[in-house]
């Protein structure tokens, strides 16, 4: 490829990725040679993410396009979910500026540029429509996350968590690759758009059997990534052992990236495969397995959370349950699937990052991770208690919060399709009621229990900014949800260019 051809490519589609990559390289070099104060590295990382958000906003009006021989696309889907990834990353980086003095991260500079590399991997996963770039993004996210979990090298729990994460992550990646290999063997291509063209024709029954096997392998492999039951056993230990901002990253950015990969692969590949003698697609036939996975994930996640008293383990099981909720719209495919998933991920990101920001601040004060860190919080810091209450009510799905809007839309979406998924909707409603018990236990600690220590709690300014922004956003989206939905419909036309990507970018 000559220089003129190289320069003629649509590199502007990758400007947000270039900004994150450049910042990670620049910060690593500066930290290596100049030994910068970690606060300057943190501010540099935050500035890079904000700049990437601005550059992405300038691309909102850009029509769907592709680069790198069609393996990287910028469509409504990638724009919408990259906005969430970058916004969540900025909030987590702001939270991470407050350090744990009693249990510090030794290599604080590495912490920030590894975070940026993990974010870059997640962004690549949002835009990739080729197995090669998908896998590069997945591994960039995974390898950086493994190191982030174990970056507190002198902490035994952190080392144990990193080891468990590496082993389980490696197993999940191997199974995912095995499933991808079947698709490559059947189609002779690693490009998802090319696969759609192959599957548009008639397929022999033996090929359909191999495709069903590939579906199951990919479902199992990616279930490790999003921590659904029974592939969730790593999550509680990893959440507990990692530094709190890393836990927030795993519970939001990493989980969202896993769902993006599931959506790309399953809805673009398997939904295009017709089953012989049936009007249903292969995805429609196999979605029963996703329904079973969603059901047991919602049940086990919420029931086991009832017995958790370590606050990070409690939120780990809460996250497992929410992964089950997010699988429901993938079973009950409807015109509302994409917007309900986007809004739910937005609400989930805000309430989780906000809650983890407060948890991080309380752990810094008490050096404990038990649920008793919330004891008497209303007397010690009324504002913090009220803000945490907003997050808890939103996680529980109480009306007036963004969490309620997200859950009710998924619930109604399950009933809107034909045939309606009454069992799945009933399980979702029942497990939501169960979640009230462990969520309201935190409220009980804050308002109705008296702690041994009565001194006032003063959280760092950066944590106050993060939790205030998240709380205000949750209330606004809960009262006027059309603000979020109108933004989604105006800038991210997913139904236009997601399912018909080959026609749009060519």
From Swiss-Prot:
Segments crossing the lipid bilayer: 14-34, 40-60, 72-92, 109-129, 131-151, 166-186, 209-229, 256-276, 286-306, 314-334, 343-363, 385-405, 420-440, 465-485
Pfam family name, one: Proton_antipo_M
GO process terms (BP): ATP synthesis coupled electron transport
Top EC category: translocase
Cystine residue pairs: none
Molecular function in Gene Ontology: NADH dehydrogenase (ubiquinone) activity; NADH:ubiquinone reductase (non-electrogenic) activity; quinone binding
Subunit structure of this chain's protein: NDH-1 is composed of 14 different subunits. Subunits NuoA, H, J, K, L, M, N constitute the membrane sector of the complex.
Protein's name according to its UniProt entry: NADH-quinone oxidoreductase subunit N
């Amino acid at each position: 490829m000559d220089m003129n051809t190289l320069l003629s490519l649509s590199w502007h589609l990758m400007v947000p990725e270039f900004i994150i990559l450049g910042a990670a390289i620049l910060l690593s070099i500066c930290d290596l040679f100049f030994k910068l104060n970690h606060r300057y590295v943190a501010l540099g990382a935050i500035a890079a993410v904000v700049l990437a958000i601005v550059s992405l906003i300038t691309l909102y009006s850009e029509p769907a396009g592709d680069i790198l021989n069609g393996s990287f696309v910028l469509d409504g889907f990638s724009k919408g979910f990259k906005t969430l990834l970058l916004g969540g990353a900025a909030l987590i980086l702001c939270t991470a500026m407050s350090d744990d003095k009693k249990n510090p991260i030794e290599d604080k500079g590495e912490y920030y540029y590894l975070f940026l590399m993990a974010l870059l991997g997640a962004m690549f996963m949002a835009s990739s429509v080729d197995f090669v770039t998908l896998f590069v993004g997945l591994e960039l996210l995974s390898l950086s996350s493994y190191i982030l979990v174990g970056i507190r090298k002198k902490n035994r729990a952190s080392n144990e968590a990193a080891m468990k994460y590496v082993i389980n992550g490696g197993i999940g990646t191997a199974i995912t690759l095995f499933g991808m290999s079947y698709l490559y063997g059947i189609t002779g291509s690693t490009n998802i758009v090319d696969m759609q063209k192959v599957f548009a024709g008639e397929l022999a029954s033996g090929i359909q059997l191999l495709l069903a096997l590939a579906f199951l392998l990919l479902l199992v492999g990616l279930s490790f990534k999003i921590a659904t039951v029974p592939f969730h056993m790593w999550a509680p230990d990893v959440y507990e052992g990692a530094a709190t901002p890393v836990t927030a990253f795993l519970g939001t950015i990493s989980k969202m990236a896993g769902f993006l990969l599931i959506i790309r692969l399953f809805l673009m590949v398997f939904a295009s495969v017709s089953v012989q003698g049936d009007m249903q697609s292969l995805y429609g036939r196999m979605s029963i397995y996703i329904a079973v996975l969603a059901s047991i994930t919602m049940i086990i996640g919420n029931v086991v959370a009832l017995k958790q008293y370590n606050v990070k383990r409690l939120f780990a099981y809460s996250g497992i349950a929410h992964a089950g909720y997010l699988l429901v719209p993938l079973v009950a495919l409807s015109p509302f699937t994409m917007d309900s998933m986007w809004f739910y991920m937005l609400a989930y990101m805000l309430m989780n990052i906000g809650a983890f920001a407060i948890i991080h601040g309380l752990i810094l004060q008490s050096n404990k991770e038990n649920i008793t860190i919330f004891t008497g919080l209303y007397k010690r810091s009324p504002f913090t208690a009220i803000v945490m209450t907003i997050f808890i009510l939103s996680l529980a799905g109480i009306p007036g919060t963004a969490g309620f809007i997200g859950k009710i839309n998924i619930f109604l979406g399950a009933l809107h399709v034909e045939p309606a998924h009454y069992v799945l909707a009933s399980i979702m409603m029942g497990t939501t009621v169960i979640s009230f018990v462990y969520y309201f236990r935190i409220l009980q600690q804050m308002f109705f229990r008296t702690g041994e220590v009565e001194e006032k709690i003063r959280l760092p300014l950066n944590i106050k900014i993060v939790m205030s922004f998240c709380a205000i956003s949750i209330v606004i989206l809960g009262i006027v949800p059309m603000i979020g939905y109108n933004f989604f419909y105006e800038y991210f036309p997913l139904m236009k260019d997601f399912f018909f990507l080959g026609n749009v970018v060519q």
